[in-house]
Regions:
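Enzymes that bind and transform nitrogen-containing heteroaromatic metabolites
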Residues: 2-228
Length: 228
């Protein structure tokens, strides 16, 4: 098993970050079925100063006043880009590219912003670009080990949410299933291990939206995973 070494020399390192319910839901009808201010603050702290890579639908899910995400280079993948527009171009404060490979090639060539190093003793410092959604982008990135500039995703940062039993939180988009060392069954190969996780806390201002639109008290925990 490889141990995390915070003194390792800098090199391109790709991370993926998302929030999910304990049932794996990450979205519903093109948005997220929760309000989670603590997760938004955590997301900004982890990703600020680094390129963030997303699909077009993820980009469009952000309110216009929040696009592009500040203090980060925004790279948007749009499969409809063809022909003369196949090379990266800027629009609405973001770089637009036709594929995940093009996004990673662009991100791999970018220097980190001065405000990027905020976790000198954590694996977050290793990450030089983050994938932030949506489901198909996560799935492609996590299934490959030949990603341009990076090879593969090395770090995953995920936030878990749960609410009281009996309140159903529904969705139509799910987080990737991960073979985590601490939870695989006997004989199943593990791909990830837990580097750290926070204690469960109740959100002061956040909530989960159930199937009828009701607001339910929300509990959350942050978890960091690394490749084995």
């Amino acid at each position: 098993m490889r141990e995390y070494d915070s003194s390792s020399p800098a090199r391109p390192c790709l991370g993926a970050i998302w929030a999910q319910t304990d049932a794996g839901i990450i979205g519903r009808d093109g948005t997220m079925p929760w309000r989670a201010p603590e997760d938004l603050a955590h997301f900004k702290t982890v990703t600020v100063g680094k390129p963030v890579i997303m699909g077009r639908r993820t980009w469009e899910s952000f309110p216009p006043r929040f696009r592009p995400l500040p203090e980060r280079t925004n790279i948007v993948i749009s499969r409809s880009i063809t022909g003369d527009s196949a090379t990266p171009f800027e629009r609405d404060g973001a770089f637009w590219v036709p594929s995940l490979d093009a996004a990673l090639t662009l991100a791999g060539d970018m220097p980190l912003a001065p405000n990027a190093t905020r976790h000198p003793d954590s694996p977050h410092q290793r990450v030089t670009a983050w994938i932030i959604g949506g489901g198909s982008v996560y799935a492609e990135a996590l299934s490959r080990e030949d990603l341009p500039s990076f090879g593969r995703v090395e770090i995953i940062e995920r936030t878990f949410f749960y609410c009281q039993e009996g309140n159903e939180i529904t969705g139509d988009t799910y987080a990737p299933e991960l073979a985590v060392e601490e939870f695989v069954t006997a004989g199943e190969p593990a791909r990830w291990r837990i580097l750290g996780e926070s204690a469960w806390e109740k959100s002061e201002r956040g909530y989960l939206l159930d199937a009828s639109g009701g607001k339910n008290p929300m509990y959350y925990s942050f978890q960091t995973l690394a490749r084995l």
